[in-house]
Amino acid sequence: MNSTKRLKMSTTFHDYDLEEPLTSNARPLKNSVITIRVIKSFPYRNVKNIVLHDYDLADKTAKDLFNDVLNKIQNEGSFRPFRNVKFDTLKIYTHAHGSKTVNLVINFDHDDDWTLDIENDKKKLFEYGIENETEISLFNKEDYLRFKENPEEKW
Protein backbone atom coordinates (compact mmCIF):
# COMPACT_ATOMS: atom_id res chain seq x y z
CA MET A 1 0.00 0.00 0.00
CA ASN A 2 1.47 3.34 -0.93
CA SER A 3 1.89 6.18 1.57
CA THR A 4 -0.79 8.39 -0.02
CA LYS A 5 -3.43 5.72 0.36
CA ARG A 6 -2.39 5.10 3.98
CA LEU A 7 -2.62 8.82 4.73
CA LYS A 8 -6.16 9.07 3.35
CA MET A 9 -7.30 6.06 5.32
CA SER A 10 -5.96 7.33 8.62
CA THR A 11 -7.18 10.92 8.30
CA THR A 12 -10.65 11.87 9.50
CA PHE A 13 -12.50 14.34 7.32
CA HIS A 14 -15.54 16.29 8.48
CA ASP A 15 -18.26 16.80 5.92
CA TYR A 16 -19.76 19.76 7.74
CA ASP A 17 -18.73 23.26 8.70
CA LEU A 18 -19.20 24.36 12.30
CA GLU A 19 -19.52 27.95 11.10
CA GLU A 20 -22.39 27.10 8.77
CA PRO A 21 -25.80 28.38 9.98
CA LEU A 22 -28.52 25.98 11.10
CA THR A 23 -30.98 25.07 8.36
CA SER A 24 -33.76 26.67 10.38
CA ASN A 25 -32.00 30.02 9.95
CA ALA A 26 -30.62 29.51 6.44
CA ARG A 27 -33.92 29.60 4.54
CA PRO A 28 -35.94 32.80 4.27
CA LEU A 29 -39.32 33.00 6.02
CA LYS A 30 -41.08 33.09 2.66
CA ASN A 31 -39.43 29.84 1.54
CA SER A 32 -39.72 27.50 4.53
CA VAL A 33 -40.32 23.79 4.89
CA ILE A 34 -42.69 22.75 7.66
CA THR A 35 -44.12 19.38 8.58
CA ILE A 36 -47.74 18.96 9.62
CA ARG A 37 -48.39 15.85 11.71
CA VAL A 38 -52.03 14.94 10.95
CA ILE A 39 -53.27 12.90 13.92
CA LYS A 40 -56.26 10.64 13.41
CA SER A 41 -55.98 8.62 16.63
CA PHE A 42 -53.90 9.28 19.73
CA PRO A 43 -54.22 5.85 21.40
CA TYR A 44 -53.44 3.98 18.18
CA ARG A 45 -50.70 6.45 17.16
CA ASN A 46 -52.28 6.93 13.76
CA VAL A 47 -50.31 9.86 12.32
CA LYS A 48 -49.53 10.88 8.73
CA ASN A 49 -47.29 13.77 7.74
CA ILE A 50 -47.80 16.53 5.22
CA VAL A 51 -44.59 18.31 4.26
CA LEU A 52 -45.16 21.82 2.97
CA HIS A 53 -42.31 23.13 0.81
CA ASP A 54 -41.70 26.82 0.06
CA TYR A 55 -44.28 27.85 2.65
CA ASP A 56 -44.55 31.56 3.45
CA LEU A 57 -44.28 32.02 7.22
CA ALA A 58 -44.02 35.80 6.91
CA ASP A 59 -47.41 36.39 5.28
CA LYS A 60 -49.47 33.28 6.11
CA THR A 61 -51.54 33.06 9.29
CA ALA A 62 -52.56 30.06 11.39
CA LYS A 63 -55.96 30.27 9.72
CA ASP A 64 -54.30 30.08 6.27
CA LEU A 65 -52.20 27.10 7.35
CA PHE A 66 -55.25 25.33 8.78
CA ASN A 67 -57.21 25.84 5.54
CA ASP A 68 -54.25 24.80 3.35
CA VAL A 69 -53.79 21.57 5.30
CA LEU A 70 -57.53 20.74 5.32
CA ASN A 71 -57.53 21.29 1.56
CA LYS A 72 -54.67 18.79 1.13
CA ILE A 73 -56.49 16.25 3.32
CA GLN A 74 -59.65 16.61 1.23
CA ASN A 75 -57.85 16.38 -2.12
CA GLU A 76 -55.09 13.81 -1.65
CA GLY A 77 -56.19 10.18 -1.87
CA SER A 78 -53.73 8.96 0.75
CA PHE A 79 -55.59 11.02 3.37
CA ARG A 80 -59.00 9.44 2.67
CA PRO A 81 -59.02 7.61 6.08
CA PHE A 82 -58.39 10.96 7.83
CA ARG A 83 -61.39 12.74 6.31
CA ASN A 84 -63.84 11.61 9.00
CA VAL A 85 -61.93 13.43 11.79
CA LYS A 86 -63.13 16.89 12.78
CA PHE A 87 -59.77 18.67 12.96
CA ASP A 88 -59.93 21.87 14.97
CA THR A 89 -56.49 22.49 16.52
CA LEU A 90 -52.94 23.24 15.38
CA LYS A 91 -50.15 22.96 17.95
CA ILE A 92 -46.38 23.12 17.58
CA TYR A 93 -44.91 19.66 18.15
CA THR A 94 -41.26 20.68 18.04
CA HIS A 95 -39.09 23.54 16.83
CA ALA A 96 -36.22 22.88 14.45
CA HIS A 97 -33.17 21.50 16.27
CA GLY A 98 -35.12 21.44 19.54
CA SER A 99 -35.59 18.46 21.78
CA LYS A 100 -38.51 16.20 21.00
CA THR A 101 -41.09 15.02 23.47
CA VAL A 102 -41.12 11.51 24.93
CA ASN A 103 -44.59 10.91 23.48
CA LEU A 104 -44.35 9.97 19.81
CA VAL A 105 -47.78 11.31 18.91
CA ILE A 106 -48.20 14.68 20.60
CA ASN A 107 -46.35 17.17 22.77
CA PHE A 108 -48.23 17.40 26.09
CA ASP A 109 -46.27 20.51 27.13
CA HIS A 110 -46.90 24.13 26.13
CA ASP A 111 -50.67 23.85 25.61
CA ASP A 112 -51.07 27.58 26.20
CA ASP A 113 -48.20 29.05 24.21
CA TRP A 114 -47.69 26.53 21.37
CA THR A 115 -51.34 26.18 20.30
CA LEU A 116 -52.09 28.32 17.25
CA ASP A 117 -55.20 30.48 17.07
CA ILE A 118 -56.84 29.30 13.84
CA GLU A 119 -59.50 32.02 14.10
CA ASN A 120 -56.93 34.84 14.08
CA ASP A 121 -56.38 36.04 10.53
CA LYS A 122 -53.90 38.77 11.55
CA LYS A 123 -51.10 37.02 13.49
CA LYS A 124 -48.47 35.63 11.12
CA LEU A 125 -46.95 32.17 11.59
CA PHE A 126 -43.47 33.50 12.37
CA GLU A 127 -45.01 35.45 15.29
CA TYR A 128 -45.78 32.09 16.94
CA GLY A 129 -42.07 31.24 16.79
CA ILE A 130 -42.51 29.01 13.75
CA GLU A 131 -39.45 28.83 11.52
CA ASN A 132 -38.03 26.53 8.86
CA GLU A 133 -38.28 22.82 9.81
CA THR A 134 -40.82 23.31 12.60
CA GLU A 135 -43.22 20.39 13.11
CA ILE A 136 -46.87 21.18 13.84
CA SER A 137 -49.61 18.78 14.92
CA LEU A 138 -53.17 18.92 13.56
CA PHE A 139 -55.80 17.14 15.65
CA ASN A 140 -59.22 17.16 17.29
CA LYS A 141 -58.94 18.99 20.62
CA GLU A 142 -61.56 16.89 22.42
CA ASP A 143 -59.69 13.69 21.46
CA TYR A 144 -56.43 15.27 22.65
CA LEU A 145 -57.82 16.26 26.06
CA ARG A 146 -59.29 12.79 26.55
CA PHE A 147 -55.94 11.18 25.65
CA LYS A 148 -54.03 13.62 27.88
CA GLU A 149 -56.15 12.55 30.87
CA ASN A 150 -55.35 8.90 30.23
CA PRO A 151 -52.40 8.53 27.80
CA GLU A 152 -52.87 4.81 27.24
CA GLU A 153 -51.69 3.44 23.92
CA LYS A 154 -53.75 0.59 22.50
CA TRP A 155 -51.48 -1.16 20.09
From Swiss-Prot:
Name of the protein this chain belongs to: Altered inheritance rate of mitochondria protein 29
A Pfam entry, by short name: DUF2340
Localization annotation: Cytoplasm
Signal peptide residue numbers: none
Chief subcellular location: cytoplasm
Entry keywords, A to Z: Cytoplasm, Phosphoprotein
Phosphoserine, modified sites: 78
Organism: Saccharomyces cerevisiae (strain ATCC 204508 / S288c) (Baker's yeast)
Role according to the record: May be involved in mitochondrial organization and biogenesis.
Lineage top rank: taxon: Eukaryota
GO cellular component: cytoplasm
Keyword Cell inner membrane: no
Other comment: Present with 1230 molecules/cell in log phase SD medium.
Protein family membership: Belongs to the UPF0538 family.
